[in-house]
Amino acid sequence: MAKKVQAYVKLQVAAGMANPSPPVGPALGQQGVNIMEFCKAFNARTESLEKGLPIPVVITVYADRSFTFITKTPPAAVLLKKAAGIKSGSGKPNKDKVGKVTLEQVRQIAETKAADMTGSSIETKMKSIAGTARSMGLVVEE
């Protein structure tokens, strides 16, 4: 028989840097999960990624206090900021442009995020990423 799911916990944790301090500790402690066990497993799974990159993770907590987790790709905004070489997006994206990204960079980001995005073709995913870039005050160059 399948295990009974107690809760789903969604967090963003820096790759390779999970530790029992907030936000990880309180969120998992509330569910009665062994926090250090999660931290070790998460850090092991994300050691190949760039250290400090925020990684969305969905933790499934079962009634017997065991857990499984799924890591996703970093948010598009984080990848766009990295590609454009900026610290943060524009406060007024329609007026103040803070950087530029090329269509090739948008394609690479869309391919990276392909598994986590909806849309059938890479072109539709590129349009979505380009829209995110524009809403951050980035100019998408051909």
UniProtKB/Swiss-Prot annotation:
GO biological process entries: translation
Report any Pfam family annotated for this entry. Answer: Ribosomal_L11_N
Query: Which keywords describe this protein according to UniProt?
Result: Methylation, Ribonucleoprotein, Ribosomal protein, RNA-binding, rRNA-binding
Gene Ontology MF, one: large ribosomal subunit rRNA binding
Q: How is it modified after translation?
A: One or more lysine residues are methylated.
UniProt GO cellular component terms = cytosolic large ribosomal subunit
Q: How does it assemble?
A: Part of the ribosomal stalk of the 50S ribosomal subunit. Interacts with L10 and the large rRNA to form the base of the stalk. L10 forms an elongated spine to which L12 dimers bind in a sequential fashion forming a multimeric L10(L12)X complex.
Give the protein's function: Forms part of the ribosomal stalk which helps the ribosome interact with GTP-bound translation factors.
HAMAP family tied to this protein: Ribosomal_uL11
Which family does the entry's similarity section mention?
Belongs to the universal ribosomal protein uL11 family.
Q: Which NCBIfam families match?
A: L11_bact (TIGR01632)
Record protein name field: Large ribosomal subunit protein uL11
